[in-house]
């Protein structure tokens, strides 16, 4: 059973502070949290100093996630926007985050770029 499933099985509230980069993820880990969250807004702001308006590509989100996953031993949950369009792209999105080592993603129910 992976680390996130074990955490969820405890039934307790899990606090997953948002990381903007590997350093902030390391600080989250050092302060004893159980999990790390990566939001698309944090990625857009920290990497490009832009608001989250759906302009980030799947590759940009996954690369940020991979960098954070490699920096910590905690499970990482990532914002995968809207899955990047249709069913085949959503499948590709899931696979890309899985290969990056992300424990879970969430998909938003919006239309638009991401």
Q: What are these model-predicted stretches?
A:
Residues 17-22, 55-62, 82-100:
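Glycine-rich anion/phosphate-binding loops
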Residues 14-16, 34-35, 75-77, 104-106:
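Structural preference for beta-strand elements that scaffold enzyme active sites
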Residues 36-60, 82-87, 105-114:
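Glycine-rich, proline-tolerant flexible connector loops at the mouths of alpha/beta enzymes
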Residues 2-3, 10, 49-78, 100:
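Alpha-helix-loop-beta-strand connector modules within alpha/beta enzyme cores
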Residues 63-64, 69-77, 85-87, 92, ...:
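Catalytic cores and adjacent flexible loops of soluble metabolic enzymes
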Residues 25-42, 101:
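Catalytic domains of carbohydrate-active enzymes, especially glycoside hydrolases
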Residues 1-18, 22-31:
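N-terminal amphipathic alpha-helix/helix-capping segment at the start of soluble metabolic enzymes
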């Amino acid at each position: 059973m992976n680390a996130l499933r074990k955490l969820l099985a405890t039934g307790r509230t899990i606090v997953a502070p948002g990381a903007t980069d590997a350093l902030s993820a390391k600080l989250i880990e050092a302060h004893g949290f159980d999990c790390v969250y990566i939001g698309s807004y944090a990625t857009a702001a920290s990497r490009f100093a832009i608001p989250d308006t759906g302009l980030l590509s799947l590759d940009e989100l996954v690369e940020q996630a991979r960098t954070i996953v490699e920096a910590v031993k905690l499970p990482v949950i990532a914002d995968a926007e809207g899955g990047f369009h249709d069913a085949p792209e959503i499948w590709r999105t899931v696979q890309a985050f899985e290969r990056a080592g992300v424990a879970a993603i969430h998909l938003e129910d919006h239309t638009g770029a991401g």
